[in-house]
């Protein structure tokens, strides 16, 4: 980006904020057309700042910014409305989604489909069982980031996954039929793999096994570094 470039009316969500100097904030956002962007919100911590009541996580915003460095300058933010405030477990799950985006996405790498998946997940978190919502988002995240998560073809033979067979998932290879020396790897049924490929988490076994499989994959791509939000939610057994 050049120093003079300005972005206007960009749909975005706030992922994280932290204080900067005496009265300002650095705001990490996830935008539809520009991906994850860091912005300085000058004076946002002042009591009378127009930005103070707008820069909120999990709320759909329209944002204007300018600048060409790694950290841009926030010019304007407008609340778009329509998203209920998250509370309780739904709120903690929202923090989990945000942490995944901060840790796994690159700066200024646009993923419009991932943006829509994130917006959909936020809108659904307060309405019922959060587990299927989290699993769909995790799967979309890994696919959108180009990790090539194959689910419907066997990794060693390229044959269609058999719903009645048992598999282990080998990272960078895919599902392989379970053998005697595969102890220690999470097993997954062929039916679960096919359900995941179609985004169907209605079966209890699929929901249980997909949680273990997606955790294995996410931990790998995080380089084994723990997620703070997952530690907080461990006792709630939602992640």
Curated annotation (Swiss-Prot):
UniProt entry tagged with the keyword DNA repair: yes
A single cellular component GO annotation: bacterial nucleoid
Domain of life: Bacteria
Record keywords, A-Z: DNA damage, DNA recombination, DNA repair
The keyword Acyltransferase is annotated on this UniProt entry: no
InterPro entries the UniProt entry points to: ARFGAP/RecO, DNA_rep/recomb_RecO_N, NA-bd_OB-fold, RecO, RecO_C
Pfam families, alphabetized: RecO_C, RecO_N
Function: Involved in DNA repair and RecF pathway recombination.
NCBIfam families named among the record's database cross-references: reco (TIGR00613)
PANTHER family in UniProt: DNA REPAIR PROTEIN RECO
Similarity annotation: Belongs to the RecO family.
Protein name from the UniProt record: DNA repair protein RecO
